[in-house]
A protein has these predicted regions:
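Active-site histidine-anchored catalytic micro-motif
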Residues: 169
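Catalytic metal-binding/acid-base residues of hydrolase active sites
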Residues: 191
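Conserved "HGTGT" condensation-loop signature of ketosynthase/thiolase-family condensing enzymes
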Residues: 1-108, 112-155, 175-178, 194, ...
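Short conserved active-site loop signatures built around small residues
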Residues: 166
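Internal active-site segments that recognize and position negatively charged phosphoryl groups
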Residues: 172
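Short, high-confidence coil segments that cap the C-terminus of an alpha-helix
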Residues: 181-185
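Short catalytic-loop micro-motif centered on adjacent basic/acidic residues
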Residues: 156-160
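Conserved residues at the C-terminal ends of beta-strands
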Residues: 188
Length: 209
């Protein structure tokens, strides 16, 4: 089989330097740093007090408030980046739905959601855990929600390979296109693990400075 040439036609990002590619690139060129004091929880009892937090991202730019409440933050960040990449590519998702696949990784998935719902269960009883807990927490939900949101009907999967996940997803997407399985792939990675349990765990394994 002849190998297809693979090109990148659209870019999208939500990260500590900016909530889109233009702002991120401008900040990087200006030498700005996305690392700063953690603001999402009290770090007074933690050795590590710094992280790269996404600031000012409005999930309602991609989903309505009701739907956003049913999704973990990593999924919302992935949707924001995917929306920009799809728009940047100029592809017609409705016309090309059968030809577009999704490979989006997450190493931990909805870790803050797991913490929140565990605390809720401990305080109010486990029967009070949200019915959306499982679909919010599982790592493949970013890829799934992108496919659902944009009506994409090609392959949809999530490699869970820790810090290499995003690169893994891009590599897998490259092979899917090159080898003729799908003409188009939406690919990348999303993470949101700046939480007491996440920072505590990475600190204990001495992976943070």
């Amino acid at each position: 089989m002849e190998k297809r040439r693979v090109v990148i036609t659209g870019l999208g990002t939500v990260n500590p330097l900016g909530n889109n590619t233009a702002d991120s690139w401008a900040a990087a060129r200006a030498g700005k740093c996305g690392i700063g004091p953690i603001t999402q929880f009290d770090t007074s009892e933690f050795k590590c007090k710094l992280a790269g937090e996404v600031k000012g991202f409005d999930p309602e730019t991609v989903v309505d408030k009701k739907e956003a409440r049913k999704m973990a933050r990593f999924t919302l960040l992935a949707l924001g980046a995917a929306a920009e990449a799809i728009q940047d590519s100029g592809i017609d998702c409705e016309a090309e739905a059968e030809n577009i696949g999704v490979i989006v990784s997450s190493g931990i998935g909805g870790l803050p959601t797991i913490e929140e719902q565990h605390s809720r269960g401990e305080e109010k009883g486990m029967e009070k855990v949200s019915p959306y807990f499982v679909p919010m927490a599982i790592a493949n939900m970013a890829a799934a929600q992108i496919a659902i949101r944009f009506g994409l009907k090609g392959m949809c999967t999530c490699p869970v390979t820790a810090c290499a996940g995003g690169t893994n997803a891009v590599g897998d997407a490259f092979h899917r296109i090159r080898d003729g399985y799908e003409p188009v792939m939406v690919c990348g990675g999303a993470e949101s693990c700046i939480s007491p349990l996440g920072i505590g765990g990475f600190t204990s394994m001495k992976a943070l400075s």
